[in-house]
Amino acid sequence: MTPLDKGLDKARVLIEALPYIQKFAGKTVVIKYGGHAMLEQDLKEKVMLDILLLHSVGIRPVVVHGGGPEINSMLTRVGKESHFVRGLRVTDKETMEIASMVLVGKLNTEIISLLNRFGGRAVGLSGKDAQLLQAVKKPMQFQNSQGELEDVDLGFVGEIEQIRPEIVTSLVEQGYIPVISPVAGGEDGESYNINADTAAGEIAKALKADKFLLLTDVPGVLRDVEDKDSLLSVIKEDEISGLIDLGVISGGMIPKVECARAALQGGVGSVHILDGRIPHAILLELFTDGGIGTMFNA
Protein backbone atom coordinates (compact mmCIF):
# COMPACT_ATOMS: atom_id res chain seq x y z
CA MET A 1 0.00 0.00 0.00
CA THR A 2 1.42 3.36 -1.03
CA PRO A 3 1.52 6.40 1.29
CA LEU A 4 -1.27 7.91 -0.81
CA ASP A 5 -3.44 4.81 -0.35
CA LYS A 6 -2.85 4.93 3.40
CA GLY A 7 -3.81 8.58 3.45
CA LEU A 8 -6.98 7.90 1.47
CA ASP A 9 -7.94 5.13 3.93
CA LYS A 10 -7.58 7.57 6.81
CA ALA A 11 -9.69 10.11 4.94
CA ARG A 12 -12.44 7.52 4.38
CA VAL A 13 -12.48 6.75 8.11
CA LEU A 14 -12.90 10.43 8.93
CA ILE A 15 -15.66 10.87 6.36
CA GLU A 16 -17.51 7.83 7.74
CA ALA A 17 -17.28 9.30 11.24
CA LEU A 18 -18.40 12.81 10.25
CA PRO A 19 -22.22 12.33 10.33
CA TYR A 20 -21.98 10.64 13.74
CA ILE A 21 -19.76 13.41 15.12
CA GLN A 22 -22.28 15.98 13.89
CA LYS A 23 -25.21 14.00 15.30
CA PHE A 24 -23.73 13.50 18.77
CA ALA A 25 -22.10 16.92 19.24
CA GLY A 26 -23.39 18.46 22.47
CA LYS A 27 -24.87 15.14 23.64
CA THR A 28 -24.03 13.42 26.92
CA VAL A 29 -22.49 9.94 26.73
CA VAL A 30 -22.10 7.96 29.97
CA ILE A 31 -19.35 5.33 29.80
CA LYS A 32 -19.19 2.48 32.31
CA TYR A 33 -15.47 1.66 32.29
CA GLY A 34 -14.60 -1.80 33.58
CA GLY A 35 -13.40 -5.27 32.74
CA HIS A 36 -10.15 -6.14 31.00
CA ALA A 37 -9.83 -2.62 29.60
CA MET A 38 -8.93 -1.46 33.12
CA LEU A 39 -6.15 -3.99 33.57
CA GLU A 40 -3.91 -3.70 30.49
CA GLN A 41 -1.93 -0.48 30.15
CA ASP A 42 -2.20 -0.35 26.36
CA LEU A 43 -5.98 -0.79 26.49
CA LYS A 44 -6.26 1.78 29.29
CA GLU A 45 -4.51 4.35 27.16
CA LYS A 46 -6.68 3.61 24.11
CA VAL A 47 -9.86 4.00 26.17
CA MET A 48 -8.61 7.33 27.52
CA LEU A 49 -7.74 8.54 24.01
CA ASP A 50 -11.22 7.53 22.80
CA ILE A 51 -12.80 9.54 25.62
CA LEU A 52 -10.63 12.54 24.83
CA LEU A 53 -11.53 12.38 21.15
CA LEU A 54 -15.23 12.39 22.06
CA HIS A 55 -14.64 15.44 24.21
CA SER A 56 -12.59 17.17 21.51
CA VAL A 57 -15.42 16.95 18.93
CA GLY A 58 -18.03 18.41 21.28
CA ILE A 59 -19.48 15.26 22.85
CA ARG A 60 -19.89 15.29 26.65
CA PRO A 61 -18.42 12.11 28.16
CA VAL A 62 -19.09 11.10 31.77
CA VAL A 63 -17.08 8.12 33.06
CA VAL A 64 -18.20 5.73 35.82
CA HIS A 65 -15.63 3.06 36.67
CA GLY A 66 -15.64 -0.28 38.41
CA GLY A 67 -12.75 -2.06 40.07
CA GLY A 68 -13.75 -5.54 41.25
CA PRO A 69 -10.51 -7.33 40.28
CA GLU A 70 -8.38 -4.63 41.90
CA ILE A 71 -10.43 -4.84 45.11
CA ASN A 72 -10.02 -8.63 45.10
CA SER A 73 -6.27 -8.23 44.64
CA MET A 74 -5.98 -5.80 47.54
CA LEU A 75 -8.09 -8.00 49.82
CA THR A 76 -5.81 -10.94 48.97
CA ARG A 77 -2.73 -8.85 49.76
CA VAL A 78 -4.04 -8.04 53.23
CA GLY A 79 -5.14 -11.63 53.79
CA LYS A 80 -8.89 -11.02 53.69
CA GLU A 81 -11.06 -13.53 51.85
CA SER A 82 -13.77 -12.33 49.43
CA HIS A 83 -17.31 -13.68 49.73
CA PHE A 84 -20.07 -13.23 47.15
CA VAL A 85 -23.82 -13.87 47.21
CA ARG A 86 -25.55 -13.85 43.81
CA GLY A 87 -22.65 -11.90 42.37
CA LEU A 88 -22.71 -9.23 45.08
CA ARG A 89 -19.73 -8.80 47.35
CA VAL A 90 -20.43 -9.27 51.06
CA THR A 91 -18.89 -6.07 52.40
CA ASP A 92 -18.07 -5.76 56.08
CA LYS A 93 -16.59 -2.58 57.57
CA GLU A 94 -12.99 -3.48 56.77
CA THR A 95 -13.83 -4.59 53.24
CA MET A 96 -15.71 -1.33 52.64
CA GLU A 97 -12.71 0.68 53.77
CA ILE A 98 -10.46 -1.28 51.41
CA ALA A 99 -12.95 -0.99 48.52
CA SER A 100 -13.19 2.76 49.04
CA MET A 101 -9.41 3.08 49.17
CA VAL A 102 -9.03 1.16 45.90
CA LEU A 103 -11.93 2.79 44.03
CA VAL A 104 -11.56 6.38 45.19
CA GLY A 105 -7.94 6.63 46.26
CA LYS A 106 -6.26 4.50 43.59
CA LEU A 107 -8.30 3.79 40.47
CA ASN A 108 -10.13 7.11 40.23
CA THR A 109 -6.86 8.97 40.64
CA GLU A 110 -5.14 6.82 38.01
CA ILE A 111 -7.90 7.43 35.46
CA ILE A 112 -8.00 11.20 35.86
CA SER A 113 -4.19 11.36 35.83
CA LEU A 114 -4.07 9.45 32.55
CA LEU A 115 -6.78 11.59 30.95
CA ASN A 116 -5.06 14.78 32.07
CA ARG A 117 -1.65 13.54 30.91
CA PHE A 118 -3.09 13.16 27.42
CA GLY A 119 -4.41 16.72 27.48
CA GLY A 120 -7.85 16.29 29.03
CA ARG A 121 -9.59 18.18 31.82
CA ALA A 122 -10.78 15.34 34.04
CA VAL A 123 -12.15 15.71 37.56
CA GLY A 124 -12.47 12.78 39.96
CA LEU A 125 -15.58 12.27 42.09
CA SER A 126 -17.02 9.61 44.31
CA GLY A 127 -20.74 9.15 44.76
CA LYS A 128 -20.34 10.80 48.18
CA ASP A 129 -19.20 14.12 46.72
CA ALA A 130 -21.94 16.76 46.77
CA GLN A 131 -24.30 13.89 47.75
CA LEU A 132 -24.21 12.67 44.16
CA LEU A 133 -25.32 9.16 45.16
CA GLN A 134 -27.37 8.58 48.30
CA ALA A 135 -27.85 4.94 49.22
CA VAL A 136 -29.57 2.66 51.69
CA LYS A 137 -28.48 -0.80 52.77
CA LYS A 138 -29.44 -3.32 50.09
CA PRO A 139 -31.90 -5.92 51.37
CA MET A 140 -31.54 -9.40 49.94
CA GLN A 141 -33.23 -12.76 50.27
CA PHE A 142 -32.46 -16.12 48.74
CA GLN A 143 -34.17 -19.48 48.71
CA ASN A 144 -32.55 -22.16 50.85
CA SER A 145 -32.51 -25.90 50.16
CA GLN A 146 -35.92 -26.24 51.85
CA GLY A 147 -37.40 -23.66 49.49
CA GLU A 148 -37.73 -21.08 52.25
CA LEU A 149 -36.69 -17.46 51.85
CA GLU A 150 -33.84 -16.36 54.08
CA ASP A 151 -32.54 -12.85 54.66
CA VAL A 152 -28.91 -12.28 53.69
CA ASP A 153 -26.83 -9.51 55.23
CA LEU A 154 -24.54 -8.12 52.53
CA GLY A 155 -23.01 -5.60 54.90
CA PHE A 156 -22.20 -2.24 53.35
CA VAL A 157 -23.68 -2.99 49.94
CA GLY A 158 -26.12 -0.29 48.96
CA GLU A 159 -28.83 0.46 46.49
CA ILE A 160 -29.28 3.99 45.22
CA GLU A 161 -32.17 5.81 46.86
CA GLN A 162 -31.53 9.31 45.52
CA ILE A 163 -29.24 10.90 42.96
CA ARG A 164 -28.24 14.55 42.76
CA PRO A 165 -26.56 15.04 39.37
CA GLU A 166 -26.06 18.82 39.65
CA ILE A 167 -22.33 18.54 40.34
CA VAL A 168 -21.85 16.38 37.24
CA THR A 169 -23.95 18.70 35.08
CA SER A 170 -22.00 21.70 36.33
CA LEU A 171 -18.64 20.11 35.55
CA VAL A 172 -19.75 19.00 32.08
CA GLU A 173 -21.05 22.46 31.23
CA GLN A 174 -17.67 23.92 32.24
CA GLY A 175 -15.85 21.59 29.86
CA TYR A 176 -14.61 19.02 32.36
CA ILE A 177 -14.77 15.22 32.10
CA PRO A 178 -16.26 13.80 35.33
CA VAL A 179 -14.83 10.45 36.44
CA ILE A 180 -17.00 8.84 39.13
CA SER A 181 -16.28 5.95 41.50
CA PRO A 182 -19.31 3.93 42.71
CA VAL A 183 -19.08 4.63 46.43
CA ALA A 184 -22.24 6.20 47.87
CA GLY A 185 -23.10 7.84 51.16
CA GLY A 186 -26.03 7.00 53.40
CA GLU A 187 -28.12 9.09 55.77
CA ASP A 188 -26.55 7.01 58.53
CA GLY A 189 -23.16 8.51 57.65
CA GLU A 190 -21.79 5.22 56.32
CA SER A 191 -20.21 4.50 52.94
CA TYR A 192 -21.84 1.93 50.67
CA ASN A 193 -20.44 -0.11 47.80
CA ILE A 194 -22.64 0.21 44.70
CA ASN A 195 -22.57 -2.10 41.69
CA ALA A 196 -20.77 -0.05 39.03
CA ASP A 197 -23.17 -0.98 36.21
CA THR A 198 -26.11 0.08 38.37
CA ALA A 199 -24.43 3.33 39.40
CA ALA A 200 -23.59 4.18 35.78
CA GLY A 201 -27.13 3.40 34.66
CA GLU A 202 -28.68 5.57 37.36
CA ILE A 203 -26.33 8.44 36.50
CA ALA A 204 -27.18 8.05 32.79
CA LYS A 205 -30.89 8.26 33.65
CA ALA A 206 -30.44 11.30 35.88
CA LEU A 207 -28.47 13.10 33.17
CA LYS A 208 -30.93 12.00 30.44
CA ALA A 209 -27.88 10.82 28.51
CA ASP A 210 -28.18 10.32 24.78
CA LYS A 211 -26.04 7.18 25.03
CA PHE A 212 -24.90 4.80 27.77
CA LEU A 213 -21.95 2.53 26.97
CA LEU A 214 -21.04 -0.55 29.01
CA LEU A 215 -17.49 -1.79 28.38
CA THR A 216 -17.37 -5.52 29.11
CA ASP A 217 -15.27 -8.59 28.35
CA VAL A 218 -17.74 -10.01 25.80
CA PRO A 219 -18.62 -8.89 22.25
CA GLY A 220 -22.24 -8.08 23.17
CA VAL A 221 -25.31 -10.31 23.01
CA LEU A 222 -24.65 -13.41 20.90
CA ARG A 223 -27.48 -15.51 19.47
CA ASP A 224 -25.17 -18.50 19.96
CA VAL A 225 -22.48 -18.08 22.63
CA GLU A 226 -20.29 -20.59 20.77
CA ASP A 227 -20.42 -18.51 17.58
CA LYS A 228 -18.65 -15.16 17.83
CA ASP A 229 -20.17 -14.17 14.47
CA SER A 230 -23.74 -14.42 15.82
CA LEU A 231 -23.70 -10.96 17.41
CA LEU A 232 -27.08 -9.24 17.67
CA SER A 233 -26.23 -5.69 16.61
CA VAL A 234 -29.57 -4.13 17.58
CA ILE A 235 -32.14 -5.24 20.17
CA LYS A 236 -35.40 -3.41 20.79
CA GLU A 237 -36.53 -2.94 24.37
CA ASP A 238 -39.67 -5.01 23.78
CA GLU A 239 -37.55 -7.93 22.52
CA ILE A 240 -35.53 -8.31 25.72
CA SER A 241 -37.95 -10.48 27.72
CA GLY A 242 -38.38 -12.91 24.83
CA LEU A 243 -34.62 -13.29 24.38
CA ILE A 244 -34.24 -14.01 28.09
CA ASP A 245 -37.01 -16.64 27.92
CA LEU A 246 -35.27 -18.26 24.93
CA GLY A 247 -31.97 -18.36 26.81
CA VAL A 248 -30.24 -16.11 24.26
CA ILE A 249 -29.64 -13.63 27.07
CA SER A 250 -28.48 -15.67 30.06
CA GLY A 251 -26.09 -15.85 33.00
CA GLY A 252 -24.06 -12.75 33.74
CA MET A 253 -25.47 -10.97 30.69
CA ILE A 254 -28.95 -10.77 32.26
CA PRO A 255 -28.14 -8.10 34.89
CA LYS A 256 -26.32 -6.01 32.27
CA VAL A 257 -29.28 -6.20 29.90
CA GLU A 258 -31.70 -5.41 32.74
CA CYS A 259 -29.51 -2.40 33.49
CA ALA A 260 -29.83 -1.41 29.82
CA ARG A 261 -33.62 -1.81 29.93
CA ALA A 262 -33.91 0.30 33.08
CA ALA A 263 -31.81 3.03 31.45
CA LEU A 264 -34.03 3.08 28.36
CA GLN A 265 -37.15 3.26 30.52
CA GLY A 266 -35.51 6.13 32.41
CA GLY A 267 -35.09 8.24 29.29
CA VAL A 268 -31.64 7.27 27.98
CA GLY A 269 -31.57 7.35 24.18
CA SER A 270 -29.71 4.09 23.58
CA VAL A 271 -27.53 1.64 25.48
CA HIS A 272 -24.53 -0.17 24.02
CA ILE A 273 -22.82 -3.30 25.39
CA LEU A 274 -19.42 -3.69 23.75
CA ASP A 275 -16.13 -5.50 24.12
CA GLY A 276 -13.65 -3.24 25.88
CA ARG A 277 -10.83 -5.63 24.99
CA ILE A 278 -10.98 -4.35 21.40
CA PRO A 279 -8.65 -1.36 20.93
CA HIS A 280 -10.61 1.88 20.39
CA ALA A 281 -13.90 0.04 21.00
CA ILE A 282 -15.72 3.28 21.87
CA LEU A 283 -14.83 4.99 18.59
CA LEU A 284 -15.65 1.88 16.57
CA GLU A 285 -19.07 1.62 18.21
CA LEU A 286 -20.06 5.27 17.93
CA PHE A 287 -18.40 6.45 14.73
CA THR A 288 -18.70 3.53 12.28
CA ASP A 289 -21.72 2.40 10.28
CA GLY A 290 -21.75 -1.15 11.63
CA GLY A 291 -20.53 -0.65 15.19
CA ILE A 292 -18.97 -3.56 17.08
CA GLY A 293 -21.36 -4.31 19.96
CA THR A 294 -25.05 -4.65 20.75
CA MET A 295 -27.19 -1.51 20.78
CA PHE A 296 -30.44 -1.43 22.76
CA ASN A 297 -33.08 1.15 21.90
CA ALA A 298 -36.76 1.76 22.32
Swiss-Prot record:
Its EC number is 2.7.2.8. It is found in: Cytoplasm. It catalyses: N-acetyl-L-glutamate + ATP = N-acetyl-L-glutamyl 5-phosphate + ADP. Keywords: Amino-acid biosynthesis, Arginine biosynthesis, ATP-binding, Cytoplasm, Kinase, Nucleotide-binding, Transferase. CDD domains: AAK_NAGK-C. Pathway: Amino-acid biosynthesis; L-arginine biosynthesis; N(2)-acetyl-L-ornithine from L-glutamate: step 2/4. It comes from the Bacteria. Substrate binds at residues 67-68, 89, 193. Gene3D superfamilies: Acetylglutamate kinase-like (3.40.1160.10). GO terms for molecular function: acetylglutamate kinase activity; ATP binding. The record marks 32, 256 as: Transition state stabilizer. InterPro entries: AceGlu_kinase-like_sf, AcgluKinase_fam, ArgB, Asp/Glu/Uridylate_kinase, Glu/AcGlu_kinase, NAGK-C. SUPFAM superfamilies: Carbamate kinase-like. GO terms for biological process: arginine biosynthetic process via ornithine; L-arginine biosynthetic process. It holds the Pfam family AA_kinase. Coiled coil: none annotated. One of its GO terms (cellular component) is cytoplasm. Belongs to the acetylglutamate kinase family. ArgB subfamily. Catalyzes the ATP-dependent phosphorylation of N-acetyl-L-glutamate. This is Acetylglutamate kinase. It comes from Desulfitobacterium hafniense (strain DSM 10664 / DCB-2). The lineage of its organism: Bacteria, Bacillati, Bacillota, Clostridia, Eubacteriales. The gene is argB.
